Amino acid sequence: MSSGGLLLLLGLLTLCAELIPVSSRQRHRDCDKPPDKGNCGPVRRAFYYDTRLKTCKAFQYRGCNGNGNHFKSDHLCRCECLEYS
């Protein structure tokens, strides 16, 4: 990863941490649902939260009719689904 990419990632992580205080953070309501790849559109890489492993994992998402446990990046998945207790 280039230094510009690392700086961007660091900035996003900082922004996520600063905008939402840890004590008041609530998880996305669909984080506990199993991954659902959907059934239409082109296949693209997305991320879902794995409740058993307590981490975000990549999967193939088809763009519609899935549940809300899909995110465009690992970072967004972690921001929305990691437990803050």
UniProtKB/Swiss-Prot annotation:
Domain BPTI/Kunitz inhibitor per the UniProt entry, residue ranges: 31-81
Assembly information from the UniProt record: Heterodimer; disulfide-linked. The A chains have phospholipase A2 activity and the B chains show homology with the basic protease inhibitors.
Protein's UniProt name: Kunitz-type serine protease inhibitor homolog beta-bungarotoxin B3 chain
Gene Ontology annotations for the cellular component aspect, listed alphabetically: extracellular space
Subcellular location, record wording: Secreted
InterPro entries, per the entry: Kunitz_BPTI, Kunitz_BPTI_sf, Prtase_inh_Kunz-CS, Serpin_venom_toxin
Family indicated by similarity: Belongs to the venom Kunitz-type family.
Keywords from the named record: Disulfide bond, Ion channel impairing toxin, Neurotoxin, Potassium channel impairing toxin, Presynaptic neurotoxin, Secreted, Signal, Toxin, Voltage-gated potassium channel impairing toxin
General function of this protein: Beta-bungarotoxins are presynaptic neurotoxins of the venom. The B chain is homologous to venom basic protease inhibitors but has no protease inhibitor activity and blocks voltage-gated potassium channels (Kv).
GO MF entry, a single one: serine-type endopeptidase inhibitor activity
Pfam families documented for this protein: Kunitz_BPTI
Primary localization: secreted
Cystine pairings recorded for this chain: C31-C81, C40-C64, C56-C77
